[in-house]
Swiss-Prot record:
Pfam families: Hormone_3. CDD domains: PAH. One of its GO terms (biological process) is feeding behavior. GO terms for molecular function: neuropeptide hormone activity; neuropeptide Y receptor binding. This is Pancreatic propolypeptide YG. The keyword Secreted applies. GO terms for cellular component: extracellular space. Belongs to the NPY family. It is found in: Secreted. It comes from Lophius americanus (American angler). X's at positions 38 to 39 were included by homology with other pancreatic hormone type precursor sequence. Its main location: secreted. Keywords: Cleavage on pair of basic residues, Hormone, Secreted.
């Protein structure tokens, strides 16, 4: 990951704060950018990101348990 932007001091100018906010936006965009593998479907990528699921496993929810709720 890229380095986090440094927070300006408490007595920083409005221009410094605007520059910091732009740097934070850029940083967040970089670290949250979607990265899919060449053979991955978006569903597999989301399952991996959310659950660290094995892409070889079925990603559909299992509804075979009658006592789920």
């Amino acid at each position: 990951y890229p380095p986090k932007p440094e927070t300006p001091g408490s007595n920083a100018s409005p221009e410094d704060w605007a520059s910091y906010q732009a740097a934070v936006r850029h940083y967040v965009n970089l670290i949250t950018r979607q990265r899919y593998g060449x053979x991955s479907s978006p569903e597999e990528a989301v399952a991996w990101l959310l659950f660290k699921a094995d892409p070889s496993q079925d990603i559909e929810p299992r509804l075979d348990d009658d006592n789920a709720w």
